[in-house]
A protein has these predicted regions:
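Short, well-structured N-terminal submotif of metal-dependent ribonuclease cores
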Residues: 1-37, 46-58
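Donor nucleotide-sugar recognition loop
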Residues: 84-90
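Acidic catalytic patch
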Residues: 63-84
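Conserved glycosyltransferase catalytic-site signature
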Residues: 8, 39, 71, 90-92
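Short active-site oxyanion
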Residues: 31-34, 63-65, 99-104
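Nucleotide phosphate-binding site architecture
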Residues: 11-12, 43-46, 114, 123
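Acidic, PIN/NYN-like endoribonuclease modules and their adjacent C-terminal/linker elements
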Residues: 1-3, 95-126
Length: 126
């Protein structure tokens, strides 16, 4: 795995000032790797919160590279949904993005991404 992809919950927690989320993002960036998010994470983050906070959220998101949802990611997400029918499309896209790009997915969503699943990092649980 080379680099880190962040799930929506980690980014939203960091925006809310939750210290463990902020520390996890700092840790990833300080390792010299670039932090990445899927376009799906970008959508989920910007769909939450009050309009007055959108500027701050957009500025925070601009620190990350954004992986667009291309055909390869879409095909991988569809395959993941066939394998795991209960996996929702946004989560399948987020996981497919990390897997396709060869990155570790940093999340606290242990319902959809178990901590013992290869390629998953769960830094904390609420």
């Amino acid at each position: 795995m080379s680099g880190f992809s962040f799930d929506s919950n980690i980014v939203i927690d960091a925006l809310a000032g939750f210290a463990p989320a902020r520390a996890e993002i700092r840790r990833a960036f300080s390792s010299g790797a670039r932090g990445w998010i899927s376009r799906m994470v970008w959508i989920e983050v910007l769909s939450k919160g009050a309009p007055a906070t959108m500027g701050r959220a957009e500025a925070f998101l601009s620190r990350f590279g954004v992986d667009e949802i291309d055909a390869e990611i879409a095909e991988r997400a569809a395959a993941l949904r066939r394998e795991r029918p209960r996996l929702k499309s946004p989560d399948a896209i987020i996981l497919a993005t990390a897997l396709t790009r060869g990155r570790l997915l940093v999340t606290r969503n242990t319902k959809d991404f178990p901590a013992n699943m290869p390629g998953i990092r769960v830094p904390y649980i609420l």
